[in-house]
Regions:
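M16/MPP (pitrilysin/insulinase) zinc-metallopeptidase core fold and M16-derived inactive scaffolds
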Residues: 143-206, 272-276, 387-416
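An aromatic/glycine/proline-enriched structural segment found at the starts
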Residues: 267, 299-300, 304-366, 385, ...
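Acidic/histidine-enriched segments that form metal/cofactor-coordinating
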Residues: 52, 181-293, 338-343, 452-456, ...
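Buried hydrophobic packing residues in well-ordered domains
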Residues: 126, 144, 162-164, 185, ...
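Scaffold signal of the M16-like zinc-metallopeptidase fold and its non-catalytic homologs
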Residues: 172, 215, 247-299, 322, ...
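Bacterial signal peptide processing site
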Residues: 18-20
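Post-signal peptide N-terminal segment of mature Sec-exported envelope proteins
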Residues: 22-94, 98, 102-112
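C-terminal motif of bacterial Sec signal peptides marking the signal peptidase cleavage site
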Residues: 14-16
Length: 608
């Protein structure tokens, strides 16, 4: 009954949130820690009322890019993958503030039929074009999606693609220096961003159609005629170094844990290096390195121009022709290799903190195109939906025990889209993915108990406690409404269409909505057992006294649950059924295979 009520409440919250947006009220601010890993605070932003069919995220609060490996061929064919895709949205110009969106009725709507999305056509100049049908909205959305990213970084130059993209966006053009560029954007109330990920770099432009003709020359110059000013290079390189040294290491324990997990999962793989760059690599880069990288990876044959909203009929062809002035061809792209981690199972990052951030996961090849994706979506939601209470992790770790603020699971790389939206960013499509669990920070005395509790829930979900008919039915009802929020805006519809093109498929969201209704409980459990292997989960913890934690892990020392106490030092009584489970959890074997399987690293060494 509790699960049904929790699911109903979650679905009601989704509906209420959509209705609140429909009548034009501003959304509540999201908790900062839920925003995607490296958020770019440097971009300037001003309010813009969006007619994009939904609330647009603030450019200044959008997340950043990604870096990672040796030359283009080697990068995509090389070793293993993982990564710090966390950081990747550099922003310039104005951010949207949000306006009305259409309402949503949860389960009352029939499932959306799978609809064929537009396909990419190659123009004479080699540039791809993907245009959603023109509508009567006042906002025009443009995306320049390059099949280039952190995997294209040469060895010893982690962060080069990200820095090149930031130089293009924020370093000025031949016609406008950086200050003049900002001044030109301000009165247009436009968004101009870039997001760098492992395999993709996306320049995003969004503007009212009345200002489109003023924005287009700026966008063209940003991509075709960067200024490459040595002073701007020095400034932006220093920003990137500070982002790693100060923001990530010192001020963002949760995303430090996530980034560290991705580097662990993709040991010796092009995904395994921080997209933002490693400090020593960044400091070694020259402006000549950046210019050469831009010419090598931002080429016409790797570009798809995406359009959505109320754009002029000839805009796509005009942009494709303009951007055919890019270098025509780059080195052929090789396939991204499968990820096979060779690192320790436990990475313990030593840092003086009041609580411990925990992330755990394993790499796999599950993608949107896989026949199991709908079943895995249901299982993942039932196990730990992002920022919702209808999953086992939230009910049993937070609700029953009060361990922390939230506990979530993901079946693909996830970075939140910003604002109060709990949806994932688009533009993060990859040939390799990962399963991960994110435990929000816990009290240091409870960190090993929390880890054991999460691992026990995962083990039981694939063996002793399969998802029930009730859980699957309730989760389907929740997703029936929740998935309607995923593509409410033109910008998100365009993002998904471009992601579909990456995977070689059409209509992912519509197909997923339809398939959710067809999957049986048996199929959900079979897919979950097929893909999830608790023994392969690797663990990152960020907190103090990690040498002692290592000893406890290797010795198998029990870690009892410490419940919160009142002012008199008394803990509220707990049901015997719960404390009996606690007794089992505290002694759960963690599976360390010896000293080399547990690595302790000072925070100053991470991404150095």
């Amino acid at each position: 009954m509790r699960r049904i009520l929790a699911g109903a409440l979650a679905a009601a919250v989704v509906v209420a949130c959509a209705e609140k947006q429909r009548v034009g009220k501003a959304p509540d601010a999201a908790a900062g820690a839920d925003a995607s890993p490296s958020q770019d605070k440097a971009g300037s932003a001003a309010g813009m009322a969006s007619a994009d069919g939904g609330t647009q995220p603030s450019a200044a609060n959008a997340p950043k890019g990604a870096p990672g490996m040796s030359s283009a061929d080697a990068a995509r064919s090389g070793t293993e993958l993982s990564g710090p895709a966390a950081s990747g949205t550099a922003t310039s110009g104005m951010a949207a503030s949000g306006t009305a969106t259409s309402g949503m009725a949860a389960s009352a709507h029939p499932p959306a039929a799978a609809t064929a999305a537009p396909t990419v056509t190659r123009t004479a100049g080699g540039v791809g074009l993907l245009a959603l049908p023109v509508n009567d909205k006042a906002i025009v959305n443009l995306e320049l999606r390059f099949r280039s990213g952190a995997v294209d970084d040469p060895a010893g130059k982690a962060g080069l693609t990200y820095l090149a993209a930031r130089m293009m966006l924020k370093g000025g053009t031949k016609a406008l220096d950086s200050k003049a560029l900002l001044n030109a954007l301000f009165p247009l109330a436009a968004v101009l961003d870039v997001r760098v990920d492992k395999e993709l770099t996306t320049f995003v432009a969004r503007v009212h159609k009345d200002n489109l003709e003023k924005l287009l020359p700026i966008l063209r110059d940003v991509v075709l005629s960067p200024r490459w000013d040595p002073a701007e290079f020095k400034r932006l390189r220093e920003e990137a170094v500070n982002d790693v040294e100060k923001r990530l290491r010192q001020g963002d324990d949760e995303n430090l844990g996530k980034e560290s997990l991705w580097s662990l999962l993709y040991t010796n793989h092009p995904y395994g290096r921080l997209t933002l760059g490693h400090v020593t690599d960044l400091k070694s880069m020259s402006i000549e390195d950046v210019r050469a990288q831009a010419a090598r990876v931002f080429t016409a044959d790797r570009l798809v121009v995406g359009l959505a909203g109320g754009y002029p009929a000839q805009l796509g062809e005009q942009l494709a022709q303009a951007f055919s002035a890019l270098p025509q061809k780059s080195a052929a792209e090789g396939p991204v290799a499968q990820a096979h981690p060779r690192g320790p199972r436990f990475l313990l990052v030593e840092k003086i903190t009041d609580s411990t951030a925990i992330s755990l996961g394993m790499p796999w090849a599950l993608s949107h195109k896989d026949p199991d994706f709908a079943a895995m979506t249901i299982a993942r939601s039932a196990f730990g939906e992002h920022r919702q209470f209808n999953g086992r992790l939230m009910q049993r770790l937070r609700e029953a025990r009060g361990l922390n603020y939230g506990d979530y699971a993901y079946i693909e790389h996830f970075e939140q889209d910003g604002g109060d939206a709990a949806t994932a960013q688009t533009g993060r499509a990859r040939h390799q993915q990962e399963f991960s669990i994110w435990l929000r920070p816990v009290q240091n005395e409870n960190r090993l108990f929390a880890l054991r509790a999460a691992l026990r829930e995962l083990q039981r979900s694939v063996k002793d406690e399969a998802f029930t008919e009730e859980e699957v039915g309730q989760t389907k009802g929740f997703l029936d409404g929740y998935l309607l929020l995923f593509d409410q805006t033109d910008s998100r519809r365009l993002g998904y269409a471009l992601d579909d093109a990456f995977y070689g498929m059409n209509g992912f969201i519509g197909t997923l909505r339809a398939q959710i209704h067809e999957v049986s409980t048996e199929q959900v459990n079979a897919a979950w057992r097929k893909w999830v292997d608790p023994a392969r989960m690797q663990v990152v913890m960020v907190g103090p006294d990690m040498a002692e934690v290592k000893k406890a892990i290797l010795a198998g020392t029990p870690s009892p649950m410490h419940y919160q106490k009142d002012a008199q030092g008394n803990a509220s009584p707990k049901p015997k059924a719960l404390t009996d489970v606690d007794d089992v959890v505290q002694a759960l074997p963690l599976g360390a295979q010896g000293d080399a399987d547990v690595s302790v690293v000072p925070v100053e060494k991470m991404f150095e």
